[in-house]
Amino acid sequence: MSSRHRLDLDGSGRGDRRRSPNRRSRSRSRSPHRRSSPDRKRQIGAVGNMKIQINPYNNQPFSNRYWAIWEKRSQLPVWEYKEKFMELLRNNQCITLVGETGSGKTTQIPQWAVEFMKQQQQGQPPGQARLVACTQPRRVAAMSVATRVAEEMDVVLGQEVGYSIRFEDCISERTVLKYCTDGMLLREAMNSPLLDKYKVLILDEAHERTLATDILMGLIKEIVRNRADIKVVIMSATLDAGKFQRYFEDCPLLSVPGRTFPVEIFFTPNAEKDYLEAAIRTVIQIHMVEEVEGDILLFLTGQEEIEEACKRIDREIQALGADAGALSCIPLYSTLPPAAQQRIFEPAPPNRPNGAISRKCVISTNIAETSLTIDGVVFVIDPGFSKQKVYNPRIRVESLLVCPISKASAMQRAGRAGRTKPGKCFRLYTETAYGSEMQDQTYPEILRSNLGSVVLQLKKLGTEDLVHFDFMDPPAPETLMRALELLNYLQAINDDGELTELGSLMAEFPLDPQLAKMLITSTELNCSNEILSITAMLSVPQCWVRPNEMRTEADEAKARFAHIDGDHLTLLNVYHSFKQNQEDPQWCYDNFINYRTMKTADTVRTQLSRVMDKYNLRRVSTDFKSRDYYLNIRKALVAGFFMQVAHLERSGHYVTVKDNQLVNLHPSTVLDHKPEWALYNEFVLTTKNFIRTVTDVRPEWLLQIAPQYYDLDNFPDGDTKRKLTTVMQTLQRNAGRGY
C-alpha cells in the first residue's frame, strides 16, 4: 500500500525518498466501476427477493435520490459479501467481521441486519425483539452514520432510523435501526439486562476497546447464553479480530477488504519540537506545492488545538493572496453540533480561474481514523499523538494526557489517504520512533481508567463477583479495589459491596459517581437548580475562549464573571448570564465565551433535569439574598468531591489530602488568593502537578459531610491531620456548649 520517505519540513528539499524494502504493496486489482444489473437495482429496496418500487419501511415510493445513492452503495467493497453475511447470520448466533475503513461495513451491515430481522418476522406473531442496534464509540459517528443511513434507506432521521447519544435521543416508536454510543446501550442494559427489544446487536469499532465496549462484550456473552433468538455481530477495522473471535467461543470470521490505492509514507528526519507548528507548516506546503488535486486530513488531539490550527491556517492562506487556491478548514471533534459535523462531507471549493488548486482541510481528532470515512482525502498529516485517559490508582489521579499513538493507529491514519486515488501520508515523527517507540496496539481503556463508573454500572446490572466478570482483558485488582473504595465512601455501596438505594439512584444519571452524588445531595441543601447548572458546565469542554492575539482582553472578560470563592461559582455566573442574555451568540463572542459549549451545557442541563423529575428529586434554590445561598452550593460540592481536596501547607505548597501529592493551583483559576482548603474538579499532569477548577471550602464541612473519609484515626500524620484535629476539637467543644 505504501512506500516510505523522509519528510523535509525545513524547506531545504533534502528529504530522503528511499523506498523501504520491508514495506509491501497493498494495492488491489478490484475494479472500482462495477455496474449493477437493472434487476438487482429493483430488488435492493425490497424485503426478500420481490421486485418492488415501494419502500417497505414507510410504504412510500422510493425517491430518485434513493436510486442515485444506491448506485454508490453498490460500489462499496462490502456489497459483494451480502449473501455470505446473511448466510452466516442465519446459521450462527455470533459473527466477527473485519472490514477496513471505507469498506462500507458501518452503513451496510446494519441495514442487512434489519432486512434479516424483517425476514424472520414474516409469518410470526408480533414479538418484543423488533430493533437492530449498532454501537459506536463516539457520539459524532453515531449521529453522522445514522444521518447517512436514513438517506440510504429513504426514510426520515428519527423515524425508522435514529440515534441515541448521551443527553440526546433521536428515535421514535417507528425506529427499527438505532445507532447509539456503546455507553448508551450499556445504560439501557441496566434497566433491561437481556436487552429484550433487540433482535440484532452490532458492536462496531470494537478494536477501539473503549470501557463501555469491553463491558458490553462481557454482558453480551451472558445475554447470548440466555436468549437463543438474539444475533450478535462484532465488527473491527483491524486484523486483531482473532482475539474477538476467540472471546466469543470461536465464532465465524468474515473478512471484507477495503478498496485502497497506494500511499506514499513520509517521515521527518528529526523529531519535531512543536508538532502543532510543524502540522500547520505541512498543510501550507501541501496546499501550495502539491500539483495533484485532493483534500487534506490533519489529525490533532482536541478541540482547543483544532480551533487554533483552523484560525492560523486561515490567516496564512489569506496572507498568500488571490493567486493561491482557496483552502476551506473544517474542524471535527465530538462536541460539534450535528450541522457542523456534516460540513466534512461538503466538496472542496472550486479551483481559481488561474488554475490554482482549491482544497478542503479537515482537522480532526482520532475520530477520523476509523469511525468516519471522508472521501476526497489524498493527503494525511499525522503528528503521532492523541489524547488518552491515564489513571494512577495509587494516588487516585486520572488525567487526559497527550500520548503517542500506536502503530495500528498510525496505519489506520495513513490508510485514509488511499480511499479514492493514490495518496501521501506525512508522519511528523521519525521512522526510528515508529519502529521502536510506538506500541503495536492501543492499550485498552479498561486497563488505564478510573473504574468507578464501570463498577457502579456493573453493580446496577446485578454483577456480584467483579473479580470473575468475563473481561476480555481483566483490569488490575488494585484498580478495582480503588473503584469499590470510592463508591463505598460515596455511600453508593455498603461495606459488603452491595448497591445501596443511593447508589442505585446515582447509577441512573449519565455522570461520574462524584457528580451524581453531588447532584442528588443538592436537593437536601436547597440548591439543586444551581448544582444542575454547575454539573452541566463541568460536563462540557472549557467555555473560555483565549486567542493568542487577544489574551489580555479575554482575561479581562473572564474576570468580570469571577466569584471570590472560586471557579465553580464562576461557571454558575457564566451560565446565568448566558440565559439572562437570551443565549445570544454575539454576547458570547463579546465576552470570549464559546457559544457551542454553552448550548451543549444547556442541553445537558435539560436532560439531567428530566432524570431528576423522573425520580422525584426536587429542583429548588435557596433565596439569593440569603447568606446561605453560596454556602449551600459549596457544601453540595463537598458532598461529591470531598476526596478531591488540597490543603495549603506551611511551606506555601498545596498537598492533596491523604495522597500527599504536591500540587499548584492551575493558572486558569479566577481565585485571587490562596485558600487554605481547596476543592478541585481535575488533577492536571503537565510539567507540574496542577489542580484545575478550584473552590474555597471550609474544613468543618469535610468532617461533617464525609466523616467516614475524614476519620482522623486512620489519617496519615502531617500538617493536614494536625489542622483537621484542631477543627474537630473546636466542633466538639461547640457541640458540648449546645451551639
Curated annotation (Swiss-Prot):
Residues 86-257 form the Helicase ATP-binding domain. GO terms for biological process: mRNA processing; RNA splicing; rRNA processing. It comes from the Eukaryota. It catalyses: ATP + H2O = ADP + phosphate + H(+). Pfam families: DEAD, HA2_C, HA2_N, Helicase_C, OB_NTP_bind. It is found in: Nucleus. SMART domains: DEXDc, HA2, HELICc. InterPro entries: DEAD-box_helicase_OB_fold, DEAD/DEAH_box_helicase_dom, DHX15_DEXHc, HA2_WH, Helicase-assoc_dom, Helicase_ATP-bd, Helicase_C-like, P-loop_NTPase. Residues 282-462 form the Helicase C-terminal domain. Its EC number is 3.6.4.13. A motif (DEAH box) lies at residues 204-207. Coiled coil: none annotated. GO terms for molecular function: ATP binding; ATP hydrolysis activity; helicase activity; RNA binding; RNA helicase activity. Pre-mRNA processing factor involved in disassembly of spliceosomes after the release of mature mRNA. This is Pre-mRNA-splicing factor ATP-dependent RNA helicase ddx-15.
